[in-house]
């Protein structure tokens, strides 16, 4: 009887030891793998942009013996271990070891998290916005206060896929508009990519903005930090009140700056969509940063482009025609990113996709059917979007050219351009006829009467200034104007910008126009919405190569 008792005790000890061993090595993986995956199904690496999913999937399973597990720091020499390229100066020093391998709390309100390699703490606090289909948790990496930890299941993701993302981050992320890569950790089950934390994605931001615009309060999530930011920022113009370089356009300019940096380094992103643009919030200032370099391609060596890959790149509804048509004779190059940016810009400006609903986008892109382009009313935006969505890749502007477009000029630059255009036109009488005959009807309308658009109060003030007071000489900026002449309208804008303290000294006029330059820009843009692009095209045709306009075109 006593022999049976000893045997049962021994068996119980073995069971307890096995259970403890399992809990230490495997149990915590549930923190970053909450939903059990079907091993027989095609593995999901990530979700795509606004609605679709990535067409490119990876199916190779990693060797379970590989990695840098907490209990297996000495790995098999034959196992593949992901690494940061040694020639990249990303982490000059290895992150400091955490004090203990035991579980720690991310903060007082959180349950214990998982420690990886004594350097990374992965909390159980999953990030609410900007995950793009991945499992992303808040974490602490070494002494860094906070990182976003992108968790990739090694059973469903190849080492090559992850290594490509790491290599591209190391090559390209030294820029204010590319999400920063802080490091890589790995255990037997997961690879952990440590990234700069963010507030939300551009997709989250636009959808929340659209809901607020439509006052669909029932669909809005409970108030959080993101909504607090949204309430204080006007992302789009109010009806009838144009806001040049609105916060949303500033975010779009951030994206172009990031693309220009990638293209300068001969890297194609290949998957630009609203979910892959992340928003950083600091002191109520928003910055857009490009993320997800997993499908990016570096054009190394002497090659400037590469043929279409065997599997389609990018996300459904957010691919260029050359990416969708699978024409091996055509090359996927930087213009593909610019087409994607054109779709992104339309989505940011209007809250809609230029090629329609999710189910019809790919077909419309293939057939060049821009169903929603007519919804755009801003002429600067229409002009740029049409160029970016050109079916022929060679006719799309580059990222550096897009940065020079008037859509991304601030009020001061817009007014300075009109002033220099006015000075140049005044010097060349041969330009007057073409300006008033061809351009004026599109700017002023058939009546060619710009005085009526400015209002009686404003015009009366201008006319009073033109009449010299007794004993005073009439100054040049007080000369009378011909209200049918577009050249004289440009002269008026030029004079107000150069002498606004004298011309806008009347309190009523100052209140009407607002501050210079923002208020003055809005005042004239609201009344003559075609003015900027028409004069821009006119000067581009006649004076583009002149030194005075070099900063606007080159």
From Swiss-Prot:
Keywords: ATP-binding, Nucleotide-binding, Signal. InterPro entries: IRE1/2-like, KEN_dom, KEN_sf, Kinase-like_dom_sf, Prot_kinase_dom. Residues 411-554 form the KEN domain. GO terms for molecular function: ATP binding; protein serine/threonine kinase activity; RNA endonuclease activity. Residues 51-63 have a biased composition (Basic and acidic residues). The keyword Signal applies. Residues 121-408 form the Protein kinase domain. PROSITE patterns: KEN, PROTEIN_KINASE_DOM. ATP binds at residue 150. One of its GO terms (cellular component) is endoplasmic reticulum. One of its GO terms (biological process) is endoplasmic reticulum unfolded protein response. SMART domains: PUG. Residues 36-85 are annotated as: Disordered. It comes from the Eukaryota. Residues 1-17 form the signal peptide. PANTHER family: IRE1-RELATED, NON-SPECIFIC SERINE_THREONINE PROTEIN KINASE. Belongs to the protein kinase superfamily. Ser/Thr protein kinase family. The protein kinase domain is predicted to be catalytically inactive. As the kinase activity is required for activation of the endoribonuclease domain, the protein could be inactive. This is Inactive serine/threonine-protein kinase/endoribonuclease IRE1-like. It comes from Arabidopsis thaliana.
């Amino acid at each position: 009887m006593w022999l049976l008792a000893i045997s049962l005790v021994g068996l119980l000890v073995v069971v307890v030891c096995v259970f403890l061993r399992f809990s230490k090595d495997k149990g915590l993986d549930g923190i970053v793998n909450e939903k059990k995956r079907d091993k027989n199904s095609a593995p999901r690496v990530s979700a795509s942009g606004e609605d679709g999913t990535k067409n490119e999937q990876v199916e190779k399973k990693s060797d379970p013996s590989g990695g840098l597990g907490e209990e297996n720091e000495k790995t098999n020499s034959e196992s593949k271990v992901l690494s940061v390229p040694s020639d990249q100066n990303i982490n000059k020093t290895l992150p400091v070891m955490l004090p203990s391998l035991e579980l720690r709390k991310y903060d007082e309100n959180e349950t214990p998290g998982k420690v990886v390699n004594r350097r990374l703490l992965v909390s159980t606090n999953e990030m609410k916005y900007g995950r793009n289909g991945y499992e992303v948790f808040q974490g602490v990496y070494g002494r860094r206060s906070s990182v976003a930890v992108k968790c990739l299941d090694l059973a469903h993701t190849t080492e090559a896929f992850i290594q490509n993302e790491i290599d591209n981050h190391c090559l390209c992320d030294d820029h204010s508009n590319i999400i920063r890569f802080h490091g890589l950790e790995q255990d037997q089950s997961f690879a952990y990519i440590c990234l700069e934390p963010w507030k939300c994605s551009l997709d989250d931001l636009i959808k929340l903005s659209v809901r607020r615009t439509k006052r669909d309060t029932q669909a809005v999530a409970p108030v959080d930090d993101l909504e607090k930011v949204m309430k204080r920022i006007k992302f789009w113009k109010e009806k009838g009140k144009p806001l040049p370089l609105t916060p949303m356009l500033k975010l779009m300019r951030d994206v172009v700056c990031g693309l220009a940096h990638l293209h300068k380094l001969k890297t194609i992103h290949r998957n630009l969509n609203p979910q892959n643009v992340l928003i950083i919030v600091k002191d109520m200032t928003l910055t857009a940063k490009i993320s997800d370099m997993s499908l990016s391609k570096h054009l190394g060596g002497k090659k400037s482009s590469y043929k279409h890959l065997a599997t389609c790149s990018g996300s459904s509804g957010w691919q260029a025609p050359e990416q969708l048509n699978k024409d091996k004779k055509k090359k996927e190059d930087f213009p593909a990113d610019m087409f994607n940016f054109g779709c992104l810009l339309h989505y940011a400006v209007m809250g809609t996709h230029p090629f329609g609903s999710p189910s019809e986008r790919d077909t419309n892109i293939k057939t060049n059917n821009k169903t929603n382009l007519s919804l755009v009313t801003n002429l600067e935006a229409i002009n740029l979007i049409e160029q970016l969505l050109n079916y022929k890749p060679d006719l799309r502007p580059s990222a550096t050219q897009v940065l020079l477009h008037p859509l991304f000029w601030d009020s001061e630059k817009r007014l300075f351009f009109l002033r220099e255009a006015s000075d140049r036109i005044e010097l060349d009488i041969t330009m007057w006829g073409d300006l008033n005959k061809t351009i004026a009807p599109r700017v002023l309308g058939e009546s060619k009467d710009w005085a009526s658009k400015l209002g009686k109060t404003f015009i009366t003030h201008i006319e009073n200034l033109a009449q010299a007071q007794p004993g005073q000489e009439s100054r040049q900026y007080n000369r009378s104007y011909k209200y049918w002449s577009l050249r004289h309208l440009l002269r008026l804008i030029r004079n107000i910008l150069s002498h606004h303290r004298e011309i806008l000294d009347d309190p009523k006029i100052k209140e009407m126009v607002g501050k210079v330059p923002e208020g003055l820009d809005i005042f004239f843009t609201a009344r003559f919405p075609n003015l900027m692009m028409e004069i821009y095209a006119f000067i581009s045709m006649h004076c583009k190569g002149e030194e005075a306009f070099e900063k606007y075109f080159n």
